[in-house]
Amino acid sequence: IKGLVDKTDATSTEASASEMGASPYTSQVISDMSKQSINAALAQQITDLEKEVGQAEEGEAKLELLQQLANKWDDIAKPIPQGYIYEEMAQQNPTVTYWLKAGDAYRKGYTNLQDTALASALTTKAIHAYESAIELDPSNLSAKTGLGASLVVGGGNPMTGISLLQEVVKEDPKNLEANRALGLFSLQSQQFDKAVERFITVVEQKPDAESYFYLATGYEKIGLRNEAISAYQKSKELAADPTLSQYIDRQIAELSKSN
């Protein structure tokens, strides 16, 4: 739940396609940055695998090595380098699956990231990945959802993103990711009643601490205190974050005083 209590908007920097070309965040730079926070033995395993990838010829064997590398990063919850790997795989073998995996990894990577420059670069890369997936499959709802969410966050054209997300929920009213993204936008734009509707749909399908937190925030903002307290309590039950729990306790105490 990192970033829920800290209100810093780490992904507000607008990105453009030209920035991606000039980005200092190469695959190697990202890999080196990511290795700094893991143990030396695991970092060496990844380095060795990267050398194998570099020596491999284009084709199935190289794709298999890249998949092994992506899996290594996934095992330790490092989506940013994983995104770069899936993008390389998509460039070698352009499929909707690879482009979607790249976009999803980039989007997961930029969410709540406090490095605004890197977040901007990742948002741009996510947009490119989802657009590439849509070129291959124009009706793909996952790609439309990812693109819409990325445009809302930092693509410089949030209303286009909103239109895409609304298109998704029109076709698939219960779509989890589209409802979540629309709910977050509703909170940011202070449309709290709409946010509540979206997050009710989300928690019905996937009751997690983050979604209940946002639902509680929406309830609180429209004056439904009892509902807000209940949703905050649900969030606390599902969270494994002492900082968030302390924040929720304070919110519940304030709401209880008001009753």
Question: PLM features: what roles do these ranges have?
Answer:
Residues 63, 96-100, 141-142, 176-177, ...:
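Helix-start (N-cap) detector for alpha-helical repeat units in TPR-like alpha-solenoids
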Residues 1-80:
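N-terminal leader/linker segments that initiate helical-solenoid repeat arrays
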Residues 60, 93-94, 138, 173, ...:
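Short coil turns that delineate tetratricopeptide repeat
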Residues 68, 101, 105, 146, ...:
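Canonical tetratricopeptide repeat
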Residues 43-46, 77-84, 113-129, 154-167, ...:
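Structural signature of tandem alpha-helical TPR/SEL1-like repeats
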Residues 74, 107, 152-153, 187, ...:
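Position-specific recognition of the canonical hydrophobic site in helix A of tetratricopeptide repeat
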Residues 21-29, 44-48, 59-68, 94-113, ...:
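Amphipathic alpha-helical repeat scaffolds of TPR domains
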Residues 71, 91, 104, 149, ...:
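Residue-level recognition of tetratricopeptide repeat
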